[in-house]
Each structure stands twice: as C-alpha cells, then as structure tokens.
C-alpha cells in the first residue's frame, strides 16, 4: 500500500496565539513527531520486511529520524542498524560531471551501484552484509561496517533510497519505503501561503551549515538552487512509492528560526542577489513570534540543526 503526502496549512495567527504558552507549544510539537516515530517503528515490525528504504529532501531530518526509528525498534527487542547511502560514494576521480565540469555528487551514478546491489541482496538473503565506510576527508571508501539484521531491521537512508534502481535485483516486496518530509505550511490572515516547507528547510540548512560545517550564508544560498533541482529530479518522482510517511515539522520551529536567523553574523561573501534572498527569508520568519532555542529538548530532532 502506498500513501499520499499532502501539505496542510496552519494559520500564522494561530501560531502566534499558541506561542503565548511556549512550553506547551514546544511540548505538543515534539510529541507530534515522537508519536510518529513510535508508530512507524510498530508498523515496520508489523510489516515484517528486513529492509527499510528512507528518503527525504535536504534538511528534512532524515538521518536523525532514521536513527530514532532504529532506536525505537531496538527498544522493542529487535536488532536495528542504519546505513547511509553516502557510504556508497564511488570516490574522487570517478564521479559523473555537471555541465560546468564540476563533480556531480547528487547523480545516481555517484554511487557504487554494484557494491550497493551486492549488499542489498546479502541483507535480503542472509540478514547481514559488509558495507563500506566512506571517508570524506580523503574522498574515498575506507573501512568496512558489519551490518547484522538477522533478527531485526536495517534502515538505508539517503537521497536515492526510493529509486527503484537500487532495489531492482530484489523481489518487489523486499523493502518497505519511507518518506520523511515537512507537511506544514503557513497562511496569513487572507489564507494566502506566507511560508513554505522549502523556506523552513532552507532556514534549517543555513543554521546547520553555519554551526557545524563552517559555511556562511553565501555558500548555502549558492548551493540551494542545485539542491532543490536535485530534489525535483531525484526524490519527487519516487515519493509515490512510499508506504509510510514521517512529518518532521515541529510547529514551534518557525519561531525558533526567526530568532536564530536574526542572530547569525553577516556574511561579507554574499552577492547582492543572495543578500536580497536572505532578507526576504528573514522577513517571512519575522511575521512569527520569536522564541529561544532553550525550549528545544536535548533529544529533539531539531538538535541536528542547532546542536546540543
């Protein structure tokens, strides 16, 4: 069975009203996400498939979500592990090229498909495999991770996880497909959309890139168009294959991003166009009340973006 991923509109005024009781708004937002994690863990085990393929767009929180689902499965007494498709990159000097001559890391051909197919077949047949570990500092595979899901589940997460080319050598029902994305968009007093899910993901990405990857806003905004094009090309066409959906929206986060974006230092590398883009994004979040990150629990998925 496949499910349909539909957006839902939330009134900006309703968020403003709820933000008058910030602790309750945060708690409800967190509970909405964590209840889904628990439910998905139950559904995965009930389905009986050993392999779960999980995808979602950039900054949807798919990596953290994959590990939270794995933890929930483990808490139910079943072995669980997570494999990132990034570990199957073919390595420097072997990547396909973009039209401008740069390496294309988002193409399916950037992955070692032969090795990936071998791992998936081994997982399906025996429940175990030796998967590569990719070292990004030297841009090539370095080491092996032993995957053992003989009495449990392995979650494989990444950009191309729902692409049928990955599982074409397995029986059709060998893997359960899961899509993680944001469902909440926000409407103004005229019921017109004033904040889209892609805006929220961009805010998440800007903050994470700055705090953990050493990149200013110019770098993130410079890549964002390519990132979105890659999502449209490599993720959206396969979204209908999803058996399960995970909404990673946290309603109160729109109030957090207003605060965090306003406190990020200026990036002198911004072009005039990027400066206008960032100003427009900040203006969208400025329509919401400001809340501080101290509201965010230490076990929140949002900590992937703001840190501990």
Task: Identify the meaning behind each predicted range.
Residues 1-39:
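Charged, amphipathic alpha-helical linker segments immediately N-terminal to NTP-binding catalytic cores
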Residues 7, 22, 27, 164-308:
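Conserved NTP phosphate-binding and transfer environment spanning the P-loop NTPase/kinase superfamily
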Residues 46-48, 117-173, 220-238, 253:
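Glycine-rich phosphate-binding loop used to anchor ATP phosphates in small-molecule kinases
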Residues 52-54:
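Hydrophobic anchor at the beta1->P-loop junction of P-loop NTPases
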Residues 62:
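Conserved lysine of the Walker
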Residues 71-81:
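Post-Walker A helix-loop "phosphate-sensing" segment adjacent to the P-loop in P-loop NTPases
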Residues 81-83, 90-139, 153:
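Conserved nucleotide-sensing/catalytic segment adjacent to the nucleotide-binding pocket
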């Amino acid at each position: 069975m496949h499910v349909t991923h539909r957006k839902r509109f939330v009134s900006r005024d309703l968020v403003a009203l709820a933000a008058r009781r910030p602790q309750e708004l945060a708690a409800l937002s967190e509970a909405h996400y964590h209840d889904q994690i628990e439910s998905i863990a139950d559904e995965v085990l009930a389905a009986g498939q050993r392999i779960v393929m999980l995808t979602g767009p950039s900054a949807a929180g798919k990596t953290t979500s994959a590990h939270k689902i794995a933890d929930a499965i483990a808490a139910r007494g079943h072995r669980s592990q997570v494999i990132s498709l990034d570990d199957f990159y073919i390595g420097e000097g072997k990547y396909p090229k973009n039209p401008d001559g740069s390496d294309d890391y988002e193409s399916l051909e950037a992955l070692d498909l032969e090795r990936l197919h071998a791992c998936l077949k081994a997982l399906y047949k025996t429940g175990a495999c030796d998967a590569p570990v990719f070292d990004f500092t030297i841009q090539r595979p370095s080491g092996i991770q032993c995957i053992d899901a003989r009495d449990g589940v392995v979650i494989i997460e990444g950009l191309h996880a729902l692409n049928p080319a990955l599982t074409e050598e397995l029986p059709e029902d060998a893997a359960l497909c899961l899509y993680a994305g944001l469902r909440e968009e926000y409407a103004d007093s005229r019921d017109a959309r004033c904040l889209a899910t892609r805006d929220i993901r961009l805010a998440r990405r800007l903050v994470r890139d700055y705090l953990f990857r050493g990149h200013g806003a110019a770098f993130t905004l410079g890549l964002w168009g390519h990132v979105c094009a890659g999502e449209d090309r490599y993720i959206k066409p396969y979204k209908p294959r999803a058996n399960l959906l995970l909404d990673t929206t946290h309603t109160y986060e729109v109030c957090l991003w207003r605060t965090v974006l306003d406190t990020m230092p200026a990036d002198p590398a911004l072009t005039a166009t990027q400066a206008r883009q960032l100003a427009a994004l900040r203006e969208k979040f400025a329509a919401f009340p400001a809340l501080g990150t101290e509201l965010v629990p230490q076990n929140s998925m949002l900590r992937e973006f703001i840190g501990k």
